UniProtKB/Swiss-Prot annotation:
Its EC number is 1.1.1.23. SUPFAM superfamilies: ALDH-like (SSF53720). It catalyses: L-histidinol + 2 NAD(+) + H2O = L-histidine + 2 NADH + 3 H(+). Pfam families: Histidinol_dh. GO terms for molecular function: histidinol dehydrogenase activity; NAD binding; zinc ion binding. GO terms for biological process: L-histidine biosynthetic process. Belongs to the histidinol dehydrogenase family. Coiled coil: none annotated. The gene is hisD. Its cofactor is Zn(2+). It comes from the Bacteria. This is Histidinol dehydrogenase. The keyword Zinc applies. Binds 1 zinc ion per subunit.
């Protein structure tokens, strides 16, 4: 007999619902002082000893015997070779996914713009891609080629001159799909290094690894901690928490579908969070039964079970309007609207990393091949953050050109405001360009 699932049940009608929900959503990183200090030591070593430190750490942490950095560089030819080592079906899937990701992100490109005022003053914005971006890819046999596509393609669409990928190869293990994805995505350089040392190398540069402007990509607690420390020296995408899915369902979707949608995130790791919200209590019972029945069929059953029982929940609400309120409170990474008319509810969704519309739109499609990016804000940060995109690899500069007439008129306003702040240097700099003698006579120190 299968043991019933121990997934948590919550009811929005409970007077303590808000407190219980807050407890469910709470999550603390496992980073501790010892991890933090080790990361700081690694960063310091890479900054001081460059390639020598990278070789040393690779030998120590990845179990590789390498003589020099030359052994940790993959040429473009190796990426092209990977394309021949994967199956035709795998190559077709990678290329189709890449095509869809590229097509979607092309629509995110921002253009420079300007306008001219009546006196000839020109104001505008110049959009410029980053010079170089660094992509961290977790290594080993269980690495994720989809992450290569999702991180590298937006950078190339943005116009980044050089994308540098780092991927560890523990005990010499390398995933051919990852290298093939790098080839398809247009990655320019690849180094087989990982951990905090790889992040440090990208941020500060070594004799072999070029210094980048931004570091993106997922990693373990050492990688995340290193990204925190190098932020400011370089940009970063985000510090991601555990993966999350929230399904809002009206009770009319196949409960097996919903259970498997919850599993799709729960299988990532034990801290992943999978939540179902529905006004239909009987449907919640059906999904609980599906979870119990389907769990033993999962390859990662132990991980899924720990995640579902530890951080998962089935939440009963009064109606769909309250379900949307709960969704906005949670601000999930992935939100499935598994309802009859998702378009009707979409305007009320304020906080979600990605919104999957309708019963047939599983979150897994977004992870791999729908087109939008799968690098999404977690842990409630969808309240103020957005998915990774082309705009993360572009920056904006303000453009100001003043005609003589414009400088004279704007100078009057600048002078008054600058003197109000007791910044006479600012004021006089603007006043020198004012051509109205009457104004200058009455408003400047020397009347000139």
């Amino acid at each position: 007999m299968t043991t019933p699932t121990a997934i948590r049940r919550l009811d929005a009608a409970d007077p303590d619902f808000a407190r219980h929900l807050d407890h469910l959503l709470s999550w603390e990183s496992v980073s501790d002082d010892s991890v933090n200090q080790r990361v700081l030591d690694i960063i310091k070593a890479v900054r001081e000893r460059g390639d020598e430190a990278l070789v040393e750490f690779t030998q120590k942490f990845d179990g590789l015997q390498v003589a020099s950095m030359a052994d940790l560089i993959l040429p473009r030819e190796r990426l092209e070779l990977a394309l021949t080592r994967i199956t035709p079906v795998q190559r077709e899937a990678l290329e189709k996914a890449a095509e869809r990701v590229r097509s979607y992100h092309e629509k995110q490109k921002q253009d420079s713009w300007s306008y001219t005022e009546a006196d000839g003053t020109v104001l505008g914005q110049k959009v410029t891609p980053l010079d170089r971006a660094g992509l961290y890819v977790p290594g080993g046999k269980a690495s994720y080629p989809s992450s290569v596509l999702m991180n590298a393609i937006p950078a190339k669409v943005a116009g980044v001159t050089e994308v540098v990928m780092v991927v560890p190869t523990p005990r010499g293990e390398i995933n051919e799909l990852v290298l093939a994805a790098a080839c398809i995505a247009g990655v320019d350089r690849v180094f087989t290094i990982g951990g905090a040392q790889a992040v440090a190398a990208l941020a500060y540069g070594t004799e072999s690894v070029p210094k980048v402007d931004k570091v993106v990509g997922p990693g373990n607690i050492y990688v995340a901690t290193a990204k925190r420390h190098v932020f400011g020296q370089v940009g970063i995408d985000m510090i991601a928490g555990p993966s999350e899915i929230l399904v809002v369902c009206d009770g009319q979707t196949d409960p097996d579908w919903i259970a498997m949608d919850l599993f799709s995130q729960a299988e990532h790791d034990e801290d992943a969070q999978a939540i179902l919200v529905s006004p239909d209590a009987d449907f919640l019972d059906k999904v609980a039964a599906s979870i119990t029945r389907l769990l033993p069929t999962m390859e990662r059953a132990a991980i899924v079970e720990t995640s579902i029982n530890g951080r998962g929940a089935l939440i009963k609400v009064a109606d769909m309007a309250q379900a949307i309120e709960v969704a906005n409170r949670i601000a999930p990474e992935h939100l499935e609207l598994s309802v009859a008319d998702p378009e009707a509810w979409l305007p009320q969704i304020r906080h979600a990393g990605a919104i999957f519309m309708g019963r047939h739109t599983s979150e897994a499609l977004g992870d791999y091949c729908a087109g939008p990016n799968h690098v999404l804000p977690t842990s409630g940060t969808a309240r103020f953050s957005s998915p990774l995109g082309v705009y993360d690899f572009q920056k904006r500069s303000s453009i100001i050109y003043c005609s003589p007439q414009g400088a004279s008129e704007l100078g009057k306003t600048a002078s008054v405001l600058a003197r109000g702040e007791s910044l006479s240097g600012h004021a006089r700099s603007a006043e020198y360009r004012i051509t109205d003698p009457d104004w200058k006579a009455g408003n400047t120190e020397d009347g000139k």
